[in-house]
Amino acid sequence: MLELNFSQQLGDLHLQVATDLPAQGITAIFGLSGAGKTSLINVIGGLTRPQQGRVILNGRVLVDAEKNIYLPPEKRRVGYVFQDARLFPHYRVRGNLQYGMAASMRGQFDAIVGLLGIEPLLNRFPFTLSGGEKQRVAIGRALLTAPELLLMDEPLASLDLPRKRELLPYLERLAQDVNTPILYVSHSMDEILRLADQVVVMDAGKVRAVGGLEEVWASSALRPWLQREEPSSILRVSVIGHHDRYAMTALALGDQRLWVGKLDAAEGNSMRIRINAADVSLALQPPHSSSIRNILPVKVAECLDVDGQVDVKLAIGEQWLWARITPWARDELGLKPGQWVYAQIKSVSFNRQNGPVPD
């Protein structure tokens, strides 16, 4: 558990944070430039000192301003990956990886190198590497210090699109294969959708929302960032099985079943799906014959008027599904909170696939 309760004045920015974050998975720190994202992780990493408050990691006090406790960065067991890789130019990749390597990680050197796909780079100097390769080496170096927490400050920000696409799969593998919690600073919605388990939304130095990706995505906290995008839903599902006749896979969405095109995924695997609100239509009764395979009972939670359209928030088990319809359709259906209707889902996309769901 990472316990944060501190304040810091940085020029015009007043950083004020009071929240607890889980010591597992990837937690995205999201917000516009100047929101305080990097300032937050700099306090955790020991690069700056807050004027008030405490920072506690897994029961260890990293900061207690009242007692004048500021643990030095090298004693915090916190790894840091910057926007620029900051490799030692006079060391080969192997030397960079071994610099600061914890004795307990010597036996895992080959595994980390393999995970990040940097074995072919071990004898090369940093100036011969691409931006994506440098960042993979920087991540490996940070992991080999045996950190209890890994901080990543927009590691893709300085990369062009091809290099971002090159690095993202490795970050996804980190989320699945490395048991080190990661705080991942980003202002990219696409990165958050692919990588994050939890999300912290920051604005003007303050935490505006904290929670699981699906929960925060469905809330109003991200609405200012989503105004230019088509609204959508992020849902967590698991594989039930595959159709014995058609190339279709059944997914469990709460206690309901969702059919999608056949996936190369084993029964029990969990994943996140994204459904655009425009791909969800509503009906008061289930149609008797339809080409749409997914027609699910849902409960209306609220209706929001947005730019001449109506966004309908629907409860489906313990998760939320958005539909975008016209005011005419809302009035004709007589939609109101608490009403049961049928959601017809026309299209589904996928964000991230994980291993089997634990019992």
UniProtKB/Swiss-Prot annotation:
Its EC number is 7.3.2.5. Residues 289-354 form the Mop domain. It is a peripheral membrane protein. GO terms for cellular component: plasma membrane. One of its GO terms (molecular function) is ATP binding. Belongs to the ABC transporter superfamily. Molybdate importer (TC 3.A.1.8) family. Part of the ABC transporter complex ModABC involved in molybdenum import. Responsible for energy coupling to the transport system. This is Molybdenum import ATP-binding protein ModC. It comes from Yersinia pestis. The lineage of its organism: Bacteria, Pseudomonadati, Pseudomonadota, Gammaproteobacteria, Enterobacterales.
